[in-house]
Design a protein with these regions (language model features):
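Bacterial N-terminal signal peptides
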Residues: 6-16
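Positively charged n-region of N-terminal signal peptides that target proteins for export
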Residues: 1-4
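Carbohydrate-active catalytic/glycan-binding domains of CAZyme proteins
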Residues: 21-500
């Protein structure tokens, strides 16, 4: 038994990849549950748990590139607060328009807690046909700064403090027109009281909103509603189209939690979802959000760097999940969206919006928000209150992480899986290299007609390249049996693969 285990270990080491759990299962004779890939479910390299081995491969996580027109939504009106501390941007396929909601202030002040006056917040609305150039419709709904000629949707001095909205979503699961839009909003007008916390809201058009009469998650620590403690003011909403449910991600220091609902009315008690690592300060994991990607989940984590009060910054990192509930923090080595450099508008404090990325052509649009100032506990003088707004950063479709090899060649081999669909497509940069794919049986032997030599070489830069073999054979013939894929890369960067 020891000799067999050692042989398996040697073979895995020779391939350049070792999965200790797989070795233990093989040694103990355990059966590993085989994945069945739905048709069209893109497979990324953010996690490597569906990869069996790789050789001479480098994996890289990629940072989104900021648009030169940033901020695409800046503070140009008196009520558009320079600190856009929350926001959401969606694309309405039916109306073929981008829609944005973002924070501002009404010019009024209110006592949030005894002896503490603060600006009353507003929620602003804008639209765009290209996601870059935005218009502010004159809604005439609320009087702020002495006028109703504005784009204000919600004013918290008229809505029980409900203008602090982290996420607004257009719900593809909803059948009732009056509930097409959904949101979670924070109110703190009853500070430390039973009415302070997170409310759920619905709307037919994203402009006229109805909220629950009391919080669905309370701030007050003695409310008895939250097992893990009082919720904070950094929440987000995910519509889980894979499992047809709603997930609320909540701030319960020092960790993050989730709660689920099937009807957006009744919610489960919060359960820990994303835990702080050893040595991290209690406020470090500031916020997170999630979205469906393929047959799995990705998300963004707003991370507060506060160990050194003289260098306090906030940036955005990639996270991932298999079930939407428990989240992983891949060792990416770099943020998904970085803070800006000296001279740039977003130097100190970038945070994700409450919305998933939007595909536009061959790119993903990530909208992020920048509050002009540094977050506490910053103690230095390099700070400002000038700037802020909503920015745009773009990433290649599926371009979160890639595997690559030089001209000396490398290989990536998947674990066995079943699938639905007919054809294999890849997202890769191979215009100065060679990419070929062979199809193997469960034991690792090439299947007739699908060898490396039979594969037509890819020499292109494409986000959706159809992999073909001689005689135009299709993968469909193997849909009832387990297969593996082996990718051969020569000066190639591979981002994803999908069976359609």
């Amino acid at each position: 038994m020891r000799i067999i285990t050692a042989l398996i270990l040697a073979l895995c080491l020779g391939s350049g990849f070792v999965n200790a759990d797989d070795i233990k299962r093989r040694r103990d004779g355990d059966k590993v549950e085989m994945v069945k890939l739905p048709a069209g479910a893109v497979q990324l390299f953010v996690e490597m748990d569906r990869i069996d081995s790789h050789h001479n491969i480098k994996r890289t996580f990629h940072t989104a590139q900021k648009h030169p027109a940033n901020p695409v939504i800046g503070a140009v009106k008196p009520w558009e607060d320079r600190r856009s501390t929350w926001g959401s941007v969606i694309y309405d396929d039916k109306e073929r328009v981008f829609k944005a909601w973002y924070g501002g202030q009404s010019g009024q002040k209110k006592e949030y807690m005894p002896g503490h006056l603060a600006d009353c917040s507003v929620l602003c609305y804008a639209t765009s046909t290209d996601g870059i150039h935005w218009e502010r419709p004159n809604l005439g709904m609320h009087k702020v700064f002495g006028t109703k000629e504005n784009n204000v949707v919600i004013s918290d001095d008229h809505h029980n403090g409900l203008a602090h909205w982290e996420s607004i979503a257009l719900d593809p699961l909803e059948t009732k027109p009056e509930r097409r839009y959904k949101a979670l909003g924070w109110s703190s007008f009853d500070w430390n009281g039973p009415m302070s916390g997170i409310y759920s809201m619905t709307s037919p058009d994203g402009l006229h909103w109805t909220h629950t009469p009391e919080p669905v998650f309370r701030y007050h620590p003695r409310s008895g509603k939250n097992d893990l403690g009082p919720v904070g003011d950094a929440q987000s909403l995910m519509i889980d189209t894979l499992r047809r449910r709603y997930l609320a991600f909540l701030r319960i220091l020092p960790d993050r939690a989730f709660s689920s609902s099937n009807d957006f009315v009744t919610w489960t008690r919060p359960v820990a979802s994303l835990k702080a690592r050893a040595g991290e300060a209690g406020n470090t994991i500031y916020n997170h959000m999630g979205f469906v990607y393929g047959d799995r989940y990705l998300g963004q984590l707003t991370y507060l760097h506060q160990k050194d009060p003289a260098k306090t910054l906030v940036d955005i990192w990639l996270i991932s999940s298999n079930d939407g509930e428990q989240w992983n923090r891949p060792e990416t080595g770099r943020p998904l969206i970085e803070v800006g450099d000296i001279g740039e508008w977003d130097r100190f404090n970038v945070r994700h919006t409450g919305s998933p990325p939007i595909r536009v052509g061959d790119k993903l649009y990530f909208y992020y928000r920048n509050t002009a100032n540094r977050h506490s506990p910053y103690v230095g003088k390099d700070n400002t209150q000038i700037g802020g707004g909503i920015g745009l950063a773009t990433l290649r479709v599926d371009g979160f992480a890639s595997v690559a090899a030089g001209y000396d060649g490398g290989q990536v081999t998947t674990k066995p899986f079943r699938f639905e669909g007919r054809n294999l497509h890849v997202n890769a940069v191979a215009n100065s290299g060679r990419l070929t794919v062979e199809v193997l049986d469960e034991s690792g032997k090439p299947l007739p007609g699908f060898s490396r030599e039979s594969c037509l070489v890819m020499k292109a830069d494409s986000v959706n390249h159809l992999v073909r073999w001689q005689n135009d054979v299709q993968l469909e013939k193997f849909k009832d049996r387990p297969i593996r894929l082996r990718f051969h890369l020569e000066n190639v960067r591979l981002y994803s693969y999908t069976i359609h």
